[in-house]
């Protein structure tokens, strides 16, 4: 090749990069739908959790419900906020399929995905601490395990953590994918 000649391979770089970014955008959109399912499932499972136990007579009853514990209320709110954000971010993710070179919208998603990851981590961690106390108690603090009496309640609150922690992993993957797509531009 002579000085000043244009290589025939040069134009192929842009379509390949756009194709990779388009594939990343498709995966991004799919993972957002899965994360929506995880967060809404966790919020619904925790938000509808309650159990009532009769004690000696029908007039005295013990009740366990998620709203009795602020950590569980925060967990439901955090999952609802993250789920709403994920639903609202779907159109932007679809834009990335149509326009794989979009840069500022990817930066927007990286920023807000990171903020939502922090919120979801805080909510899930707070709830996980209370779930642990419900199962194990704390002898030193005189907090007894309630799961022998409220087994259905404990199963539901434990199960609700699964979707939330799965959504946390998916958000980490989404942030990584967006960073990868941004890095491919340079």
Swiss-Prot record:
Which superkingdom does the taxonomy of this entry point to?
Eukaryota
Keywords attached to this Swiss-Prot or TrEMBL record, sorted alphabetically, are: Cell membrane, Cell wall biogenesis/degradation, Glycoprotein, Membrane, Transmembrane, Transmembrane helix
Glycosylation (residues): 50
One GO process term, biological-process aspect: cell wall organization
Q: Tell me, what does this protein do in biology?
A: Regulates membrane-cell wall junctions and localized cell wall deposition. Required for establishment of the Casparian strip membrane domain (CSD) and the subsequent formation of Casparian strips, a cell wall modification of the root endodermis that determines an apoplastic barrier between the intraorganismal apoplasm and the extraorganismal apoplasm and prevents lateral diffusion.
Subunit comment for this entry?
Homodimer and heterodimers.
Q: Which NCBIfam families match?
A: A_tha_TIGR01569
User: What family name appears in the similarity comment?
Assistant: Belongs to the Casparian strip membrane proteins (CASP) family.
Instruction: Write down what this protein is called.
Output: Casparian strip membrane protein 6
Organism annotation? Oryza sativa subsp. indica (Rice)
């Amino acid at each position: 090749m002579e000085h000043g000649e244009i290589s025939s391979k040069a134009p192929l770089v842009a379509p390949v990069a756009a194709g990779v970014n388009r594939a990343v955008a498709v995966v991004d959109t799919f993972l957002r739908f899965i994360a929506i399912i995880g967060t809404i499932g966790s919020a619904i499972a925790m938000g509808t959790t309650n159990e009532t136990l009769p004690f000696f007579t029908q007039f005295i009853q013990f009740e366990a419900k998620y709203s009795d514990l602020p950590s569980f209320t925060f967990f439901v709110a955090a999952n609802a906020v993250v789920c709403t954000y994920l639903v609202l971010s779907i159109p932007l993710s679809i834009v990335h399929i149509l326009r794989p070179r979009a840069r500022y919208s990817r930066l927007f998603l990286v920023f807000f995905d990171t903020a939502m990851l922090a919120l979801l981590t805080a909510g899930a961690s707070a709830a996980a601490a209370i779930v642990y106390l419900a199962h194990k108690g704390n002898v030193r603090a005189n907090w007894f395990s309630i799961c022998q009496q409220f087994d259905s309640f404990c199963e539901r609150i434990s199960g609700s953590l699964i979707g939330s922690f799965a959504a946390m992993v998916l958000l980490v993957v989404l942030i990584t994918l967006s960073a990868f797509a941004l890095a491919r531009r340079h």
